[in-house]
From Swiss-Prot:
Name listed for the protein in its UniProt record: Galactose-6-phosphate isomerase subunit LacB 2
EC number: 5.3.1.26
Entry keyword set: Isomerase, Lactose metabolism
Lineage: Bacteria, Bacillati, Bacillota, Bacilli, Lactobacillales
Name of encoding gene: lacB2
Catalytic activity: aldehydo-D-galactose 6-phosphate = keto-D-tagatose 6-phosphate
Record flagged with keyword Oxidoreductase: no
InterPro entries to which the protein is assigned, alphabetical: LacB, RpiB_LacA_LacB, RpiB_LacA_LacB_sf
Length: 171
């Protein structure tokens, strides 16, 4: 599998470890940087990973910053990207199986490298399980990426809220 990986300067060593791990598992890696500890900005590298995945140059992506929050938010701004900030295998698997996530984000200063590798393995092994319900959710989320007059409609999510009120969702 071809995987794009990017980070900011705070977690360069963690990214290098992820790149090395992925290569050791037989994956091809597009290393989107950064490559050293010189001060930089996470949106640059979130965008690079997102563009690699959205364009099809990479099948999936991994982004890492100190907490994971900034770079995951940045990569989510790239049209066609559904990224999830994850800290456990359950969230990573859910993000792929239910939301068809194509990028996962980590807080490299929050989570250890061995756990990060396990979570990446779980994410890569998981497969999207399309249902009519999650297809609608994904379509709704994807529509938020573009200027869309429907977003100004106060009833944009009514269909889903009505189902909630009827008790159709079960956790």
């Amino acid at each position: 599998m071809k995987i794009a990986v990017g980070c900011d300067h705070i977690v360069t060593y963690e990214k290098i470890a992820v790149v090395d791990y992925l290569k050791s598992q037989g994956h091809k890696v597009i290393d989107c940087g950064t490559y050293d500890n010189v001060r930089t900005h996470y949106p640059i590298f979130g965008k690079k990973v997102g563009e690699a995945v959205a364009s099809g140059k990479a099948e999936l992506g991994v982004v890492i910053c100190g907490t994971g929050v900034g770079i995951t938010n940045a990569v989510n701004k790239v049209p066609g990207i559904r990224a999830a900030l994850v800290r456990d295998m359950t969230s990573a698997i859910y993000s792929k199986e239910e939301l068809n996530a194509n990028v996962i984000g980590f807080g490299g200063k929050i989570i250890g490298g061995l756990l990060m590798n396990d979570i990446i393995d779980a994410f890569l092994a998981a497969e999207y399980k399309p249902t009519e319900e999650n297809k609608k959710w994904i379509e709704k989320m994807d529509s938020l990426q573009h200027t869309n007059q429907d977003q100004n409609n106060p009833h944009f999510f009514d269909e889903f809220l009505e189902k909630w009120d009827r008790g159709e969702y079960h956790d």
